[in-house]
A protein has these predicted regions:
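Bacterial N-terminal signal peptides that target proteins for export
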Residues: 1-16
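Core of compact, soluble alpha-helical bundle domains
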Residues: 25-157
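C-terminal motif of bacterial Sec signal peptides marking the signal peptidase cleavage site
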Residues: 20-24
């Protein structure tokens, strides 16, 4: 009887210790990028600044003037674009939103975006992230998400 009791205590103590250590490890796990960015509100603020910045950047050709996919930046169109960008970044950063837009390749087809224009877009996003004091690690992760879309967006080298 004594040995069974000692064995039971040892097993129970081991289980509690394992749980305690497991919970300790879980709390040290890095938060998703979404949380580290400040959630949807911060993503929304950065996206709004980015759209304003990129639309005024002549290196970007934001309206795609002179291409088969020229875009009219009406208030409704800008609102839709911002909504899709927020959804995309939210989902890519581990947030709860689902991106409901079309895939990057089909939505940018015919826009004739060049690598130089894409580089300018990245610079504008980097500036918007910096404006709101997004830390370097998180900026780097967002920029990796953006860079990951290059192959689907750039049509003209």
């Amino acid at each position: 009887m004594g040995r069974k009791w000692v064995a039971s205590v040892a097993v129970g103590a081991s289980a509690w210790l394992g749980l305690a250590l497991g919970f300790g490890c879980a709390s040290n796990a890095p938060k998703p990028l979404y949380d580290r960015l400040g959630g949807e509100q911060m993503i929304q603020v950065v996206v709004e600044d980015f759209v304003g910045r990129a639309s005024g950047d002549p290196r970007v050709n934001f309206t795609r003037k002179g291409t088969p996919q020229q875009w009219d930046p009406t208030p409704d169109n800008v609102e839709k674009l911002e909504k899709h960008l927020v959804e995309f970044l939210d989902a890519a950063a581990g947030g709860s939103q689902e991106y409901r837009g079309r895939d990057m390749k089909s939505v940018h087809a015919g826009m004739q975006i060049t690598n130089t224009e894409f580089d300018a877009i990245e610079a504008d996003m980097e500036s918007s992230l910096s404006k709101f004091d997004v830390p370097a690690q998180e900026r780097s992760e967002v920029m990796a998400i953006i860079e990951g879309t290059r192959k689907d967006i750039v049509e003209l080298k």
